[in-house]
């Protein structure tokens, strides 16, 4: 089964708001305790060219786990994000190919 990926790109009014939300994300995701059957990864990255933007990458090995996390995030994360009212774009896809280069 291919990996399921969700990419969420947010643009806040300024870098301070973005960093405040990143701190909230770090706290909320550390509290996640859903019972998942496979590996699930959350990565959060701030744009190096524009600190008012960040991207969250969610990677699931199973549809069931993705749904568990999606339900939790809808209740726990989205209401907090929506208070900041950033411009937001979300893409959900299945991984078609992966290329890795180098030893490490």
Each model region followed by its residue ranges:
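Short, surface-exposed ligand-recognition loops at beta-strand->loop->(often short) alpha-helix junctions
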Residues: 11-24
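A short beta-turn/loop motif at secondary-structure boundaries
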Residues: 45-51
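Non-catalytic surface loops within mature trypsin-like serine protease
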Residues: 12-14, 60-62, 97
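An amphipathic, aromatic/His-enriched active-site/gating alpha helix that lines ligand/cofactor pockets
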Residues: 27-40, 49, 59-94
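Hydrophobic alpha-helical core bundles mediating ligand binding, dimerization, or RNAP-core interactions
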Residues: 8-9, 25, 29
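Active-site-flanking beta-strand signature of metal-NTP-handling nucleotidyl enzymes
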Residues: 4-11, 55
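Short, low-order "capping/linker" segments at domain edges
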Residues: 97-104
């Amino acid at each position: 089964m291919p990996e399921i990926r969700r990419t969420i790109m947010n643009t806040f009014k300024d870098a301070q708001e973005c960093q405040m939300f990143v701190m909230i994300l770090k706290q909320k995701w550390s509290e996640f305790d859903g019972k998942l059957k496979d590996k699930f990864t959350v990565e959060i990255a701030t744009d190096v060219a524009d600190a008012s933007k960040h991207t969250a990458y969610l990677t699931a090995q199973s549809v069931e786990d993705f749904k568990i996390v999606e339900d939790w995030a809808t209740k726990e994360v989205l209401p907090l994000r929506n208070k900041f009212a950033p411009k937001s774009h979300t893409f959900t896809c299945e991984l078609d190919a992966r290329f890795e280069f180098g030893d490490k």
